[in-house]
């Protein structure tokens, strides 16, 4: 369907996830931009199409945040200072548009969880963010069966890491 934002949103989300899962599993932080960038570029094209159809949409800004994070993962040392602030700005916009979007808190929690403390990370803050996302999932229902609902399994996983 070429006239609705959701197909472009989901296609962009899938590109980000494919790019994330294509990254080296050895934890290396070298230049992996040849892996990450094609996925990020395609995701950006798709999410921009979604944004043309649905402006001021919290879900779209969550995916924009994910795209900037994927680019940063592609070459963290070279891109942290450029993609990091863009990712943060997209997430802040997502929260401003809908503070009850659990995906905002999942993404924020993941950042806090994986960032070393000396750079602003905090497992304690991450736990609170995952618990907030979980609370929103427990008390809200999507408007339709095709609206974004992802994130419950991530919340369950991360909360289990604190037991």
What are these regions (language model features)?
Residues 14-49, 56, 63-90, 108-153:
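Short coil/linker segments at helix-helix boundaries
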Residues 1-10, 14:
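N-terminal leader/linker segments that initiate helical-solenoid repeat arrays
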Residues 155-163:
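Eukaryotic acidic, Ser/Thr-rich intrinsically disordered low-complexity regions
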Residues 59-65, 98-104:
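A structural motif
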Residues 2-3, 52-55, 99-100, 138:
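Short coil turns that delineate tetratricopeptide repeat
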Residues 5-8, 60, 104, 143, ...:
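TPR alpha-solenoid repeat register
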């Amino acid at each position: 369907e070429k006239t609705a934002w959701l197909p472009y949103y989901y296609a962009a989300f899938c590109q980000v996830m494919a790019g994330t899962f294509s990254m080296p599993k050895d934890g290396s932080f070298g230049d992996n931009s040849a892996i990450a960038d094609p996925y990020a570029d395609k995701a950006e094209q798709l999410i921009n199409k979604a944004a043309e159809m649905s402006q001021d949409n919290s879900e779209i800004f969550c995916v924009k945040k994910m795209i900037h994070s994927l680019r940063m993962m592609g070459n963290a040392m070279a891109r942290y200072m450029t993609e990091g602030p863009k990712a943060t700005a997209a997430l802040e916009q997502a929260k401003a548009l809908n503070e009850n979007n659990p995906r905002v808190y999942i993404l924020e929690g993941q950042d806090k969880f994986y960032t070393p403390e000396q750079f602003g990370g905090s497992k304690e803050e991450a736990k609170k963010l995952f618990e907030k996302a979980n609370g929103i999932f427990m008390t809200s229902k999507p408007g339709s069966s095709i609206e974004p609902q992802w994130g419950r399994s991530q919340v369950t996983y991360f909360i289990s890491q604190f037991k």
